């Protein structure tokens, strides 16, 4: 049996994947250890990340996220370990029998020896079910009923199968009957194509976009796997925190707890300090930062009556408790506990990021002590509209007013912890006239930056609590959350997909004859080639052997022989030979695709799809008629199914995008997508930043979406040969034009232009609490190099960036204040930061 070094069991996901990737990709440094993890991750992600071993035993993984067509960490979910032979064989047998798309060539020999059983099974097969567990066991021909029941239960939990339990004649449990789940992707596509013949293309772009931008987007990639992508992906994603896809493993458990009204015991281990603790909590909300890359769970903690937060990526395990069990264990008045939770929920709009107050203990026991912040900056809304727009889009829950006569803008916001705003406020240094509530803090900060003195910021709040042993004993162990097993599951692995494809090919009617070992190997190699972008470095070596063992050991094929003419130097002298051969035990129609036509959509896939169909941007990809048809189909087939509660995952620092700009994008985006898919140019008119108008013929190259900015830009080649970037919301009109000529050349020109715009900046920072974690997480989407001098306790980080992003990099680095030092004070970013700090010091001195 092949050794699966690139596969990881669901129980080891955190240890083998998430934490190792946090070290290699997020932090960018790792001492010599865990070589197996390094090799495993390199094998899975080598095509996407720049893996390098630096002198001094530093390992490093880096990437430019804007150059990636897809999230590389979604690949991790396709390498879930399974029990060889037995599990994939049972999966293929069961779906083939229940689907109605396959027919058995002959009943198993053991069945044919029992005439009564044979007649019963022939009737069941002719009627297409229902199938009892005993029926499936007899037809599959291997294993025990208990083992098969357990495996069928696993598939039922996914939603791929449905179990109907009958009552026994004496009141006990009777037979269990099995049928296939509610809806396949093929049915979904047929529903859409009844509305629009191009629906499959529309659905593909819909899934390509939402698979990269919605939480739990890996479910969208599973749907794309089923659909089968064609053509190049039209999207790129600017400074995307792809790493957050690994947090979905824990997020789905917490979402399930919130939906079901369950308490959680969270086992938590900090990634940098390695502090281990466990807490009891009532989960309230998940927060993701589009600016800094970190994710948090906000929750109510009952022992300290507190609204608090934890980094989502540092949660190792979640255990669930019924509400009544926790209330009994706490021994508190129900009204008091309910009031605490209500106050904690009401505080959420006042949490700027993740800090819930300067003091966390008992902050939910009474009305919270909120802080009023009034930021007044120098801003001429007419002469500097970009500053006005920035303040409006980044104000979160605050209100902004402008005084045109004074040339100022004022943001008023109420928060739990005003100090948490400090990194964002630094980006306005050089303009701040006053900041009520933080004036002394900012004045000290500016003085430290001007003097170049390193400054360690203390995290707000930060109490370290532990679930008391007494309460832990009263509550018991709880039930381990397992919703993540529906996300990281072998059914979605690339191994299963290739096995299913080969199985369908062997079963197709036009290929009903026996095939030799060499012919089977050719089929396997063809399937590997079709999935080559999904393979790990070891897949093509380990899978062929295992696939043959699955087919034979799982009774999916029957042995036989076939006559073939032996290969000779002279084809006329080849002699006929009888050689061993195999044939599928099933028959199916040619062209059948197992995951599209046979395997029903899982519960999580359906719920995620329902949530995506309700998103505000879906009209960019699907017409109203297409959306209504899909929503009606979901209601018809799955009436009890609710959309996945993605509204509980909040992108806290996402910019406000004007409704009228979104409406413009919805009007022009379908035309641009059609041009990209059909290889055509566009005739468009564009409103420039300074109220000008530009019209012409443009060749679309790629669409770039920023989750932080919540907007699309397009890269085009203009009719004069210039490579331009246009905001889609500024396009006034667009029409499909003639077929593109020279698109490949224009794409090469755009790539060369991007290469010419690379710049780099190097900063250093001390090994102080959480600073390395914050900086390296925020800059994880950029290509970078990081090293650590243990003797000096100092990190050196070199960031690569595009010249057009120099302002963005400047603002981000300013957020760390005196915590960082530029190695080259003459660098343009260092000079700009110094200029702003000097100007701010002058303003505070007036």
Put a short name on every predicted segment.
Residues 4-37, 42-50, 91-123, 127-133, ...:
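Bulky hydrophobic/aromatic content
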Residues 7-12, 22-26, 337-523, 560-565, ...:
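Polybasic (Lys/Arg-rich)
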Residues 21-82, 460-478:
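Long, low-complexity, charged/polar intrinsically disordered regions in eukaryotic proteins
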Residues 57-65, 164-176:
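Short, Lys/Arg-rich nucleic-acid/phosphate-binding segment
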Residues 72-91, 485-490:
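Basic, short loop/linker segments at the boundary and entry of helix-turn-helix/winged-helix-like folds
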Residues 138:
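Alpha-helical residues within the helix-turn-helix
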């Amino acid at each position: 049996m092949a050794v699966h070094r690139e596969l990881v069991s669901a129980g080891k996901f955190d240890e083998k994947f998430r934490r190792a990737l946090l070290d290699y990709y997020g932090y960018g440094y790792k001492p010599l250890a865990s070589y197996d993890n390094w090799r495993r991750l390199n094998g899975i992600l080598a095509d996407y990340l720049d893996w390098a071993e630096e002198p001094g035993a530093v390992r490093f993984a880096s990437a430019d996220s804007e150059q990636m067509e897809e999230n590389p960490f979604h690949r991790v979910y396709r390498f879930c370990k399974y029990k060889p032979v037995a599990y994939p064989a049972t999966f293929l047998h069961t779906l083939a029998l229940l689907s109605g798309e396959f027919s058995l060539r002959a009943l198993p020999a053991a069945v044919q020896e029992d005439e009564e059983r044979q007649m019963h099974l022939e009737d069941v097969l002719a009627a297409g079910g229902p199938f009892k567990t005993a029926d499936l066991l007899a037809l599959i021909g291997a294993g025990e009923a208990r083992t098969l029941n357990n495996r069928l239960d696993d598939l039922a939990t996914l939603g791929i199968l449905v179990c109907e339990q009958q009552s026994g004649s004496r009141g006990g449990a009777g037979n269990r009957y099995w049928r296939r789940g509610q809806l396949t992707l093929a049915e979904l596509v047929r529903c859409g194509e009844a509305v629009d013949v191009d629906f499959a293309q529309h659905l593909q772009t819909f899934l390509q976009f939402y698979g990269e931008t919605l939480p739990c987007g890996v479910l969208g990639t599973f749907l794309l796997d089923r659909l089968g992508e064609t053509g190049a992906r039209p999207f790129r994603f600017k400074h995307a925190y792809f790493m957050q896809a690994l947090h979905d493993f824990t997020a789905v458990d917490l979402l399930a707890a919130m939906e079901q009204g369950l308490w959680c015991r969270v086992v938590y281990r900090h990634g940098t300090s390695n502090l281990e603790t466990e807490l009891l909590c009532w989960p309230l909300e998940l927060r993701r930062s589009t600016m800094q890359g970190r994710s948090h769970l906000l929750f109510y903690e009952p022992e300290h009556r507190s609204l608090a937060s934890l980094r989502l990526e540092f949660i190792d395990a979640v255990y669930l408790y019924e509400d009544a069990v926790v209330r009994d264990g706490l021994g508190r008045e129900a009204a008091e506990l309910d009031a605490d939770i209500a106050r904690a929920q009401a505080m959420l709009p006042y949490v700027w990021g993740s800090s819930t107050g300067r003091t966390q203990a008992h902050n939910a026991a009474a009305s919270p002590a909120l802080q009023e912040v009034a930021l007044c900056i120098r801003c001429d809304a007419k002469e500097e509209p970009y500053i006005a727009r920035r303040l409006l889009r980044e104000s979160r829950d605050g209100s902004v007013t402008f005084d045109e006569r004074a040339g100022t803008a004022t943001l008023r916001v109420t928060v739990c912890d005003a100090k948490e705003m400090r990194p964002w406020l630094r980006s306005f240094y050089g303009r701040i006239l006053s900041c009520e509530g933080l004036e002394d803090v900012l004045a000290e900060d500016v003085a430290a930056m001007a003097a170049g003195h390193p400054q360690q910021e203390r995290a707000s709040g930060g109490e370290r609590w532990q679930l008391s042993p007494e309460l832990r004993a009263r509550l018991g162990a709880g039930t381990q959350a397992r919703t993540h097993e529906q996300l990281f599951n072998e059914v979605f692995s690339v191994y299963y997909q290739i096995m299913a494809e080969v199985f369908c090919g062997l079963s197709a009617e036009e290929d009903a004859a026996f095939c030799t070992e060499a012919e089977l190997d050719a089929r396997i190699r063809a399937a590997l080639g079709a999935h080559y972008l999904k393979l790990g470095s070891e897949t093509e070596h380990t899978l062929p052997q295992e696939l043959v063992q699955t087919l034979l050991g799982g009774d999916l094929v029957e042995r036989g022989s076939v006559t073939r003419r032996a290969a000779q130097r002279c084809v006329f002298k080849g002699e006929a030979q009888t050689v061993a051969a195999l044939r599928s035990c099933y028959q199916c129609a040619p062209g059948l695709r197992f995951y599209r036509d046979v395997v029903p959509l899982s519960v999580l896939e359906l719920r995620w799809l329902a949530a995506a169909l309700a998103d505000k941007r879906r009209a960019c990809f699907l017409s109203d008629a297409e959306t209504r048809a899909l929503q009606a189909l979901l209601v018809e087939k799955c009436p009890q199914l609710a959309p996945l509660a993605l509204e509980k995952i909040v992108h806290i620092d996402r910019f406000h995008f004007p409704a009228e700009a979104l409406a413009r994008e919805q009007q022009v985006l379908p035309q641009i997508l059609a041009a990209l898919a059909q290889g055509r140019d566009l005739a468009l008119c564009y409103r420039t930043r300074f109220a000008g108008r530009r019209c012409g013929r443009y060749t679309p190259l790629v669409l770039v979406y920023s989750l932080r900015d919540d907007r699309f830009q397009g890269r085009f080649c203009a009719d004069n040969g210039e490579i331009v970037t246009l905001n889609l919301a500024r396009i006034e009109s667009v029409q499909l034009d003639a077929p593109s000529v020279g698109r490949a050349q224009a794409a090469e020109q755009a790539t060369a232009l991007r290469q010419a715009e690379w710049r780099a900046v190097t900063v250093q920072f001390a090994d102080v609490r959480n600073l390395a974690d914050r900086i390296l997480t925020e800059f994880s989407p950029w290509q970078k190099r990081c090293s650590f001098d243990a003797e000096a306790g100092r990190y050196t980080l070199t960031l690569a960036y595009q010249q057009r992003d120099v302002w963005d990099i400047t603002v981000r680095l300013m957020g760390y204040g005196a915590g960082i030092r530029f190695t080259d004070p003459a660098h343009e970013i260092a000079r700009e930061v110094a200029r702003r700090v000097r100007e701010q010091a002058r303003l505070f001195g007036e």
